[in-house]
């Protein structure tokens, strides 16, 4: 075997051993080689399976298939027999194709980014009963297997002795439940060693060396039971103290249960009775101390009364027990001069040292700095520059790649108009604030406050300060509801369009009903079908019922239909249940994140695309379904794009599965070519000709141009309603106010104009008014976001005003930041908007941009979310499904390589991936929870720290987009109410205060209304919390409270969001992120706004006018090294840190002069 083949063979052994360790807990390369040898001796998969079972290897069928496939893919090709094992898995792409340009590009990318082309593995998560029924079923199964192995051990033939020897050596490293004999032998060894050493000890000493046995393994470290003590003495070896060199993703990589080890005591916490140990400072063969200088330093005592060590430097700083509890008694740590004064008083006998706990806590230990984590000294931390092993040399290459262009022409007229629109919006906001301030000052001038102060007989309550009266006037002024909103609210509450037709007549009146027979024939003849139908044609509500009536729900199968939004899944399920004549959850149900309304009777199931993706994690073949419908596929969410690739392979493995992809836009040809050129079934909609008009010159202020166009249509055009597309709530509210004032100025000389806003924050009863017809002789104008492009069908619209902009979120992988920016729409969106005018009759579309801009500055189709969003959660799900080769995964539009590299780096930093890019045990736990990886890590860590009760509430509140209600007309009053719940150090704890107070008030809606909190959001948070508690119970995670020890909560947050850390830069007046050194700012709505917090973590970064940090909390920088020792490190005190290198020395100058006025180059030279 030459060197290359030998390296390939070693890689194969490592992969197989990793799979065995993840599946059984056994870490043994010899066992892996033995299984590879069995595979080589087998002619097919069945023979290989029988050989393994005959040797006592009781593995699941899917696990053996995975091992077989790994051997076939990685083993040197010359060594694999031509008729070797076939694991039964079909190729996702079917027949092989000739290399084309796309294949050449993929080969080039595979060379550049080998970390993105790791071989796939079989989905082992689906074999874990924890995901389908109960987490304890797996443990019971393992226990049964262990008993069977012990009973059959003595009756095996001689040829099995090799494997038996391996098992007997390794059973001690799995868990106590696998073998009682191994535990007895370990105990016997320890007793014999104790008796040979002499008398038993009472307690360990600091920096002492002891032998012990590993008694427990957790994600954060290993527990060791020390030998030679009268009472059982346990200590914790943190994961950072196990191995001297290299990074450990999990302690099980270096130690195993029952393993004898040598440890060194590095810290003793007498109050909490906890001992911190270290293995890396002890030679594990001889027991020799590798750091003896530490012991000598600890023995040097001072000659003073308090016996302070002369060299009390903490050489083990940062290695703190994760289970350590923080005291929150609010005591202030004494400064050095105060301590010196107390020492002198105690030495003179004036006071007793025992009466001063601060003095005792700080100086009655051998290492004061270690006991007090809240040191006053300035802590400098740095990033570790080591790259993950599987991404070595790839991270810097990815940063040089150009990102996906969200804007086609950055210098075009549309881009300039978008930037100008932001400036004008800020100007309008400042004008409103100045007007409110001016009116409050005018109210002040009408009152004479001096009279009540001069009159000695006046009531003290009448004596007011000018600032209080000014604030009260401003609150009263802003608390008044605008006239346009009052006109909207004064109307009768509506719950949608009323009809006198029966349910049957309504169904038969839909366009899809006429094509029922043709549609069912197309489904029966084709496995995959693309369905093209306009919004309102009935495709979402009717085709599921047609399929159920045709018999596709027989044999206990279901019809699944995905929706891009959870609100759509709930509302459609309720409508279909009403048409079927059942309750939601019976024959018709829905499943969204944290809510499942299905039962054994369910035949039609609506769900979000993310929930179907999680079902693919458990059951890749989707055996419960006979038909899968991907509805609203044109929206191209991240989950929908992932489902495209997954289901494209599933239909090849399941010929009986039907796949229907629906779209409301004209891009069905692309879907058809992607899904093996499947046929397209078109449902003709109600469409009429639309006249499209462009502007001759680009508009500088698109908002003002839109409002002028609305008034022009209202005054000069015929009857018909108007639909205006704007970008967000602020623009819509401003437009409604301006239109109302203009129509009010014209008085009764013009017909009535009903102004109706539509955006997600509005109550549903107000949104429903858009479906009601306009009053006789009047006209309604609907001002909406892009939700009205495809998701809504409004009758009576004859005129559409399209400024050509949309607000969308874009992820920057370099900064790890989401930017909410206004961008030009695509040509497909422009066509969709103009089509809204031709649903009822011939209409007109006013495009407020030039025809040249439409052709040259707009992209043909919108950028899919998968190319502009953070992919950490998506890649974690794909890894859990066994999909490691991200470059060869069949994406319709592949995401940028730098976005995938950034996601892999993030998962590696969270310890969800190991050095080979495969899932760790912690990563598998994180995949169990339907939330972002950071939140999953925070929740798992909170269980270990004992604050999971509070963390569940915080995570539930974070899952709601925004719980605060801040109407523009009552902003100051809303801010005043919000300040009642503020925690001065944390937005996260502020959310916890809101939830706790809401529960104390019995979840009252009136309480929410009084405190400007969205009751619907609070109820949603409560539902999320209940579902999370069910998941915690399923996986046997305890839910415990930390009481008043709120530092534990902040530390748990650090464990997941340590990459989102920023430090205050006093020179530039902002914060700098530690990872990228990018300037970011505190959002004005946060409790830390205007405060001098030094170190903070943030939940997310959103770019609007600036890069703002949202949901921020203060942290101790030492926690960062403790929770992420492989990501952060303390800066070398003997060298200048990178942070200090970036600091600038700014000289003092006259504050009345301009900056840099002191420079010689800025001085004007006088003439002679």
Swiss-Prot record:
Coiled coil: none annotated. SMART domains: DEXDc (SM00487), HA2 (SM00847), HELICc (SM00490), S1 (SM00316). Residues 207-280 form the S1 motif domain. It holds the Pfam family Helicase_C. One of its GO terms (cellular component) is post-mRNA release spliceosomal complex. Residues 702-882 form the Helicase C-terminal domain. Acts late in the splicing of pre-mRNA. Required for the splicing of introns with a branch nucleotide to 3'-splice site distance greater or equal to 15. Mediates the release of the spliced mRNA from spliceosomes. This is Pre-mRNA-splicing factor ATP-dependent RNA helicase prp22. It comes from Schizosaccharomyces pombe (strain 972 / ATCC 24843) (Fission yeast).
């Amino acid at each position: 075997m030459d060197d290359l083949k030998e390296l390939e063979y070693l890689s194969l052994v490592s992969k197989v051993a990793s799979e065995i360790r993840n599946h059984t807990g056994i870490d043994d390369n010899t066992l892996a080689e033995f299984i590879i040898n069995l595979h080589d001796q087998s002619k097919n998969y069945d023979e290989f399976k029988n050989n393994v079972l005959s040797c006592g290897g009781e593995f699941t069928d899917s696990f053996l298939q995975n091992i077989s496939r790994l051997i076939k893919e990685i083993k040197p090709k010359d060594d694999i027999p031509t008729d070797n094992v076939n694991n039964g898995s079909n190729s996702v792409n079917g027949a092989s194709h000739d290399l084309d340009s796309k294949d050449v590009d993929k080969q080039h990318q595979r060379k550049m980014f080998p970390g993105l082309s790791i071989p796939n593995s079989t989905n082992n998560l689906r074999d874990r009963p924890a995901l389908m029924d109960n987490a304890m079923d797996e443990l019971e199964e393992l226990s049964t297997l262990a008993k069977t192995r012990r009973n059959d051990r003595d009756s095996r033939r001689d040829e099995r002795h090799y494997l038996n020897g391996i098992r007997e050596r390794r059973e001690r490293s799995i868990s106590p439940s696998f073998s009682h004999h191994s535990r007895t032998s370990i105990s016997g060894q320890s007793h014999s060693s104790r008796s040979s050493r002499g008398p038993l000890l009472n307690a360990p000493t600091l920096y002492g060396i002891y032998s012990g046995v590993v008694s427990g393994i957790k994600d954060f470290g290993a527990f060791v039971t020390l030998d030679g003590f009268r009472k059982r003495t346990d200590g914790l070896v943190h994961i950072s103290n196990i191995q001297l060199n290299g990074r450990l993703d999990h302690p099980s990589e270096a130690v195993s249960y029952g393993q004898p080890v040598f440890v060194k005591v590095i810290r003793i916490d007498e109050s909490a009775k906890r001992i911190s140990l270290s293995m890396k400072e002890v030679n594990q063969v001889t027991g020799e101390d590798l750091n003896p200088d530490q012991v000598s330093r600890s023995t040097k005592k001072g000659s003073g009364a308090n016996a302070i060590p002369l060299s009390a430097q903490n050489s083990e700083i940062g290695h703190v027990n994760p289970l350590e509890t923080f005291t929150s008694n609010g005591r202030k740590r004494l400064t050095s001069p105060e301590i010196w004064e107390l020492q002198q008083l105690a030495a003179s006998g004036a006071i007793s040292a025992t009466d001063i706990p601060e003095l005792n806590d700080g100086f009655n230990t051998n290492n004061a700095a270690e006991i007090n984590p809240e040191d006053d000294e300035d802590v400098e931390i740095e990033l570790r520059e080591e790259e993950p092993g599987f991404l070595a040399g790839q991270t810097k290459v990815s940063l040089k790649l150009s990102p996906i262009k969200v804007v086609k022409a950055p210098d075009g007229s549309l881009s300039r108009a978008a930037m100008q629109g932001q400036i004008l919006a800020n100007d309008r906001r400042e004008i409103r604030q100045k007007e409110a301030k001016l009116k409050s000052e005018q109210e002040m001038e009408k009152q004479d406050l001096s009279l009540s102060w001069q009159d000695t007989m006046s009531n003290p309550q009448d004596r007011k300060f000018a600032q209080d009266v000014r604030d009260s006037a401003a609150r009263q002024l802003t608390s008044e509801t605008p006239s346009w909103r009052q006109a909207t609210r004064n109307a009768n509450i509506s719950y949608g369009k009323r009809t006198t037709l029966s349910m049957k007549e309504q169904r038969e009146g839909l366009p899809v009903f006429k094509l029922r027979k043709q549609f069912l024939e197309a489904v029966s003849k084709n496995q995959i079908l693309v369905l093209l139908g306009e919004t309102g044609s009935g495709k979402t509500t009717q085709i599921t019922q047609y399929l159920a009536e045709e018999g596709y729900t027989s044999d206990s199968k279901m019809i699944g239909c995905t929706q891009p939004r959870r609100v759509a899944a709930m509302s459609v399920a309720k409508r279909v249940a009403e048409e079927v004549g059942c309750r939601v959850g019976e024959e018709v149900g829905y499943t969204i994140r944290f809510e499942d309304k299905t039962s054994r009777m369910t035949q039609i199931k609506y769900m979000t695309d993310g929930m179907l993706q999680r079902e693919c994690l458990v059951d890749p073949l989707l055996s419960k379904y006979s038909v899968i419908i991907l509805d609203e596929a044109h929206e191209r969410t991240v989950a929908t794009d992932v489902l495209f690739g997954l289901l494209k392979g599933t239909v090849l493995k399941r010929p009986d599965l039907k796949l229907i992809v629906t779209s409301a836009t004209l891009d069905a040809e692309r879907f058809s070519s992607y899904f093996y050129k499947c046929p397209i079934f078109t449902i003709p909609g109600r469409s009429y000709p639309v006249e499209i008009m462009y502007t001759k010159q680009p508009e500088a202020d698109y908002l003002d141009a839109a409002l002028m166009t609305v008034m022009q249509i209202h005054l000069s055009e015929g009857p018909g309603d108007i639909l205006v597309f704007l970008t967000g709530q602020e623009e819509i509210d401003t437009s409604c106010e301006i239109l109302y004032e203009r129509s009010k100025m014209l008085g009764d000389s013009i017909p009535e104009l009903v102004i109706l806003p539509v955006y997600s924050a509005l109550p549903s009863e107000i949104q429903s008014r858009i479906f009601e017809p306009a009053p006789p002789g009047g006209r309604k104008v609907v001002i909406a976001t892009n939700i009205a492009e495809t998701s809504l069908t409004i009758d009576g619209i004859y005129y559409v005003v399209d400024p050509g902009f949309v607000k969308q979120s874009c992820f920057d992988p370099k900064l790890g930041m989401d930017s909410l920016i206004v961008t030009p729409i695509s040509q497909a969106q422009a066509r969709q908007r103009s089509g809204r005018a031709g649903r009822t009759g011939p209409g007109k579309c006013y495009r407020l941009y030039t025809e040249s801009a439409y052709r040259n500055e707009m992209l043909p189709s919108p950028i899919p979310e998968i190319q502009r969003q953070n992919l950490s959660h998506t890649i974690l799900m794909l890894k859990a499904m066994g999909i490691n080769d991200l470059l060869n995964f069949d994406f319709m539009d592949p995401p940028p390589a730098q976005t995938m590299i950034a996601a892999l780096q993030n998962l590696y930093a969270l310890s969800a991936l190991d050095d080979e890019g495969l899932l760790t045990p912690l990563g598998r736990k994180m995949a169990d929870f339907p939330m972002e990886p950071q939140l999953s890590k925070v929740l798992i860590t909170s269980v270990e720290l004992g604050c999971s009760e509070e963390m569940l509430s915080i995570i539930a509140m974070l899952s709601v987009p925004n719980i605060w209600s801040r109407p523009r007309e009552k902003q100051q009053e809303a801010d005043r109410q919000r300040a009642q719940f503020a925690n001065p150090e944390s937005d996260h704890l502020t959310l916890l205060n809101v939830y706790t107070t809401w529960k104390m008030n019995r979840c009252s809606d009136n309480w929410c209304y009084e405190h400007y909190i969205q009751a619907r959001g609070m109820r949603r948070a409560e539902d999320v919390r209940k579902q999370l508690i069910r998941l915690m119970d399923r996986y046997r995670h305890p839910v415990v409270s930390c009481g008043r020890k709120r530092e534990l909560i902040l530390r748990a947050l650090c464990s997941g969001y340590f990459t989102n850390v920023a430090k205050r830069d006093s020179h530039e007046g902002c914060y700098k992120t530690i990872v990228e050194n990018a300037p970011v700012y505190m959002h004005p709505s946060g409790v830390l706004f205007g405060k001098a917090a030094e170190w903070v973590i943030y939940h997310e970064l959103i770019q609007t006018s600036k890069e703002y940090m949202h949901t921020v909390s203060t942290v101790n920088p030492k926690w960062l090294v403790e929770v992420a020792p492989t990501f952060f490190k303390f800066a070398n005190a003997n060298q200048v840190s990178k942070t200090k290198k970036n600091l600038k020395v700014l000289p003092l100058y006259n504050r009345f002069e301009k900056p840099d006025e002191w420079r010689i180059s800025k001085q004007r030279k006088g003439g002679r």
